[in-house]
A protein has these predicted regions:
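Active-site-adjacent pocket scaffolds in enzyme catalytic domains
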Residues: 124-168
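A short helix-to-beta-strand connector/capping loop
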Residues: 3, 47, 75-80, 167-168
């Protein structure tokens, strides 16, 4: 296993901390929009970044600013796209079938827009259950990003603080 530090951007416009009006404003203006300016900073500075874009957020980008998708596709050496679900919610409360549906719909939307997608999954809020890890593995996903700080203390202390492989 190699060790590499990467910047990961959890990109979800349906976050409770972002108003719809600010998000829609960020998409306006084509290549001069705030979102394209932000993406261009990474390109200009040759700063690699891993983007995890929620499927519903990607639908907004596709409709209101496809130029942003073009920038990402044109600069695969800068942008790494990872898998996300369609909806950004607390997946801990989902049934197996709805969890799978949400993830599959997100993956389908991401793969339909981006030419190069890593087989790594970023769960909403970095939270996922043991059962959902099993479901993700069955989907063929290679890796999952987890943030121990999002879990209760009794669970958090059981999560190994370094990248690791899980078997079983």
């Amino acid at each position: 296993m190699t060790k590499k530090v990467v910047d990961i951007v959890n990109f979800n416009a349906d976050a409770s901390c972002l108003s719809s009006s600010i998000w829609m404003e960020a998409l306006q203006g084509g290549t001069n929009s705030k979102i394209c300016q932000w993406l261009s900073l990474f390109v200009r500075n040759k700063k690699k970044i891993t983007l995890g874009i929620i499927g519903s957020t990607l639908a907004d980008i596709k409709k209101y600013n496809p130029d942003a998708i073009n920038i990402i596709n044109d600069k695969k050496d800068v942008f790494e796209i990872i898998l996300r679900p369609w909806s950004h919610d607390i997946s801990l409360y989902r049934t197996d079938s709805l969890f799978i549906y949400n993830v599959e719909l997100g993956i389908k939307s991401i793969k339909s827009e981006f030419e190069s997608v890593s087989n790594y999954y970023l769960a909403p809020e970095f939270m996922i259950t043991s059962r959902q890890i099993e479901l993700i593995v069955k989907m063929g996903i290679e890796a999952i990003f987890i943030n121990p700080e999002r879990y209760q203390n009794d669970i958090k202390k059981r999560i190994i603080p370094i990248p690791h492989l899980v078997y079983g």
